[in-house]
Amino acid sequence: MKEFITKHRDKFQKISAISGAGISAESGIPTFRGSEGLWKNFRAEDLATPQAFSKNPKLVWEWYLWRRNIIETKRPNPGHFALVELERIHPDFFLITQNVDGLHSQAGSKKLTEIHGNIFINRCISCGQESKETISENTTPLPPQCQNCNSFLRPGVVWFGESYDDFKLNLSIQRMKHTDLLLVLGTSGSVSMPVYLAQIAKDSGALLIEINPERSSFSSSVDLFLQGKTGEVLPELIREILDNPS
């Protein structure tokens, strides 16, 4: 690690990071995939779709409130805080996260985009108005309604089969085209978007460093693979980067 950073220290003008479910898992948040995603015998793939919401919005909201309750008990870990420190000290850093739990913002990250949205945002299906008003099954009839137009509210996340937000996607693509060092953190590559963005960065000349407990589908494409948990490896990596400023 140290030799790699020393050799390439002139490539640290623009640093970016892509974070995935692995960094959230280290805070105790389930991935909500596979067996971890089962809720009342439903899979995430059965509930996180526009079709599921159209068919049974109350059921979908019950699942999302269950997820919100779990996430609210969790806190950012050293991996989140290491990225905050990198943002604080490095003049040109940007974070793209697949995670919808809001832990990066809770830790203090400001230069970021939540490309899959945020689970705590409520968005109207008609007028698009967004809020973070707390919704509880005990006090709010499900599905909740928009105070502006009375249409149903939905969670402010990207569902299976939906397009990404144009602004967030274009912002991420442009950042990948103009980044020197990309940190790929806790993402398995099972979702195509991080692979797509990382490939843009690589094709544009960026160096790629991946931190993961196991090799992923694009580990063969990175310049340095560091095996381990993000919360354990990333703080050390960032100390090396900040100790060797360009």
Curated annotation (Swiss-Prot):
CDD domains listed in its UniProt record: SIRT5_Af1_CobB
Active site: 116
Domain Deacetylase sirtuin-type: 1-245
PROSITE patterns the record matches: SIRTUIN
Cofactor: Zn(2+)
Enzyme class label: transferase
Keyword NAD recorded: yes
Cofactor binding mode and count: Binds 1 zinc ion per subunit.
Catalytic activity: N(6)-acetyl-L-lysyl-[protein] + NAD(+) + H2O = 2''-O-acetyl-ADP-D-ribose + nicotinamide + L-lysyl-[protein]; N(6)-succinyl-L-lysyl-[protein] + NAD(+) + H2O = 2''-O-succinyl-ADP-D-ribose + nicotinamide + L-lysyl-[protein]
SUPFAM superfamilies: DHS-like NAD/FAD-binding domain (SSF52467)
Subcellular location per the Swiss-Prot or TrEMBL entry: Cytoplasm
Positions that bind Zn(2+): 124, 127, 146, 149
GO terms, molecular function: histone deacetylase activity, NAD-dependent; NAD+ binding; protein-malonyllysine demalonylase activity; protein-succinyllysine desuccinylase activity; zinc ion binding
EC number(s) given by UniProt: 2.3.1.286
Gene Ontology CC terms: cytoplasm
Residues at which substrate binds: 64, 67
One Pfam family from the record: SIR2
Keywords (A to Z) from UniProt: Cytoplasm, Metal-binding, NAD, Transferase, Zinc
Positions with a binding annotation for NAD(+): 20-39, 98-101, 186-188, 212-214, 230
Job of this protein: NAD-dependent lysine deacetylase and desuccinylase that specifically removes acetyl and succinyl groups on target proteins. Modulates the activities of several proteins which are inactive in their acylated form.
Swiss-Prot/TrEMBL domain comment: 2 residues (Tyr-64 and Arg-67) present in a large hydrophobic pocket are probably involved in substrate specificity. They are important for desuccinylation activity, but dispensable for deacetylation activity.
NCBIfam families recorded: PRK00481.1-3 (NF001753)
Assigned protein family: Belongs to the sirtuin family. Class III subfamily.
Protein name, as recorded: NAD-dependent protein deacylase
Organism, scientific name: Leptospira interrogans serogroup Icterohaemorrhagiae serovar Lai (strain 56601)
Gene: cobB
